[in-house]
């Protein structure tokens, strides 16, 4: 948020909250506005105020939840510490709302169990359980067989082991256009295409062709002067071709991209800076595309024990 562009919109409804509400068919009055926006600007303002209390907004939210006899879902920050500056860290919210906590934990390897043990120590009985997320697909079975029982023995109920999905991690071409401030040279109407992987065309063309054949749904970043790489990328599973540096694409390249319906983007950044921006985009997964939401529902149904979760939350919900 840039204060020079005006005040924050009110109510402050997160885009993900809006999408979920539309997907589930919830009325607008069922949405709970965010209390604060986490950003360097607001953090600086908060530091200057020297106030670490949640404030009246939290009290109003707590009353709103108390007045509703249904199920309320709150997404908290990504760590136990985030939000302390606002009095809204995960432990503070759980305590203030008398709420149970389900942790969706980014699984790396067994060393990442330390974070789960720390959460259990901090949250105590408020920690209902965990879901292990973004697990390498080939490791799901071994985790369910070995790691899950071990965690259960440590008092950490595991309600699911979710495999990593390139589709869910994907971003649209339009999102890359926005983040890169790119100029769309052709196929502007194809910005809804999903990019699952990133490839950098900095090798010789023979190596590039072999590499491209092993990838799918790529964004290929290469220099504007590497016409050999550019044409090779168009013949592979490429969702968009991103040209960096000085120079313009050849007319023949534009024509071929139009024939294949591959968006051609031109950016002012160098290759390294462009790759960094794209990797940041992959790190902020959004489910605002219907195909991703549908796939996410299917993954949850297949890999999560919702019956156990509902039982732990004392919810009278039947899962078929």
Locations of regions flagged by a protein language model:
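Generic beta-sheet signal
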Residues: 70-74, 101, 218-222
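Non-catalytic interface/targeting segments
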Residues: 156, 161-223, 280-320
């Amino acid at each position: 948020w840039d204060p020079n562009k005006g005040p924050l919109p009110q109510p402050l409804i997160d885009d993900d909250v809006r999408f979920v509400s539309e997907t589930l068919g919830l009325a607008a009055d069922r949405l709970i506005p965010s209390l604060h926006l986490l950003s360097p600007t607001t953090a600086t303002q908060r530091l200057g105020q020297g106030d670490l209390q949640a404030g009246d907004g939290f009290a109003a939210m707590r009353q709103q939840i108390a007045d509703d006899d249904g199920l309320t879902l709150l997404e908290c920050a990504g760590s136990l510490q985030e939000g302390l500056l606002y009095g809204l860290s995960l432990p503070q919210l759980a305590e203030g709302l008398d709420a149970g906590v389900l942790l969706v934990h980014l699984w790396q390897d067994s060393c990442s169990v330390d974070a789960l043990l720390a959460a259990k120590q901090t949250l105590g009985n408020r920690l209902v359980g965990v879901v292990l997320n973004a697990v390498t697909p080939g490791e799901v079975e071994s985790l369910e067989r070995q790691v899950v029982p071990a965690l259960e023995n440590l008092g950490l109920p595991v309600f699911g082991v979710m495999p990593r999905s390139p589709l869910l991690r994907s971003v649209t071409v339009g999102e890359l256009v926005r983040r890169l401030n790119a100029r769309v040279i052709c196929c502007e109407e194809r910005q809804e295409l999903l990019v699952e992987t990133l490839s950098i065309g900095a090798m010789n063309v023979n190596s590039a062709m072999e590499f491209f054949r092993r990838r799918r749904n790529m964004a290929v970043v290469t220099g504007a002067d590497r016409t050999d790489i550019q044409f090779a990328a168009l013949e592979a599973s490429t969702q968009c071709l991103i040209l960096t540096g000085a120079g313009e694409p050849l007319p023949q390249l534009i024509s071929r991209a139009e024939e294949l319906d591959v968006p051609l983007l031109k950016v002012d950044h160098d290759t390294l800076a462009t790759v960094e921006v794209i990797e940041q985009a992959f790190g902020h997964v959004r489910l605002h595309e219907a195909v991703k939401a549908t796939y996410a529902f299917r993954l949850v149904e297949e890999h999560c024990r919702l019956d156990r979760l509902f039982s732990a939350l004392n919810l009278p919900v039947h899962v078929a």
